[in-house]
């Protein structure tokens, strides 16, 4: 993407072909001399944060210190859970099938109705805690059979395996605590980027 910049203002943006549809270039590529003569500059991009943690919205192309820059708005996602509500602010509930609901004469019974369980919009802390638990469960699943064997037949779990499993559980607990203590999205991202799961020996 390029921009034509004249008198400290962007007058047009697009590809070279879009900006100069009637001009042909040797080798099909505009050289730097042409770009300079026509006041063409490459568009650079402002910061785009990790979209796991931020809602990223593309904005306008603006001049920043004379450089055409594609702007982005990075809005942090919500950390905590919140009640799900409709457009009028009414609480939403998890729906269940009521097989006995009477729909009137000549109609089959049954309807989806509200339960007493609130519908919740999960925040990042809940989402990341679930991911951490899933990782721990996946790592432990490989040796769960040894735990079952120990319980059912009293066959000892190898010490290396016991140490590994304990380390997985410890790391999971550490991460859950750190996630819960994260004060903002950047702190939460730092926790998730610093996961230190043990390696099997």
Question: Model features per residue range: what roles?
Answer:
Residues 1-141, 148, 173-201:
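Interaction-interface detector
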Residues 150-157:
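Exposed beta-sheet edge/beta-hairpin loop segments within beta-rich domains
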Residues 152, 169-170:
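Short Gly/Pro-enriched loop/turn and capping motifs at secondary-structure junctions
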Residues 157-166, 188-189:
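Short, charged, amphipathic alpha-helical segments
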């Amino acid at each position: 993407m390029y921009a034509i910049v004249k008198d400290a203002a962007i007058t047009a943006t697009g590809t070279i072909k879009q900006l100069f549809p009637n001009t042909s270039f040797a080798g099909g590529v505009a050289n730097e001399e042409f770009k300079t003569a026509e006041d063409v500059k490459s568009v650079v991009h402002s910061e785009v944060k990790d979209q796991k943690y931020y809602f990223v919205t593309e904005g306008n192309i603006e001049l920043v210190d004379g450089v055409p820059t594609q702007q982005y708005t990075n809005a942090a996602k919500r950390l905590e859970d919140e009640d799900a509500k409709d457009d009028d602010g009414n609480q939403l509930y998890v729906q269940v099938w009521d097989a006995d609901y009477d729909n009137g004469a000549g109609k089959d019974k049954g309807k989806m109705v509200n339960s007493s369980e609130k519908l919740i919009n999960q925040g990042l802390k809940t989402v990341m805690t679930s991911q951490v638990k899933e990782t721990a469960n996946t790592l432990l699943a490989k040796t769960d059979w040894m735990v079952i064997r120990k319980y059912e037949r009293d066959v000892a779990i190898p010490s290396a395996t016991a140490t590994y499993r304990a380390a997985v559980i410890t790391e999971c607990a550490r991460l859950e605590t750190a996630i819960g203590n994260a004060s903002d999205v950047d702190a939460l991202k730092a926790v998730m980027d610093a996961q230190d799961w043990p390696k099997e020996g």
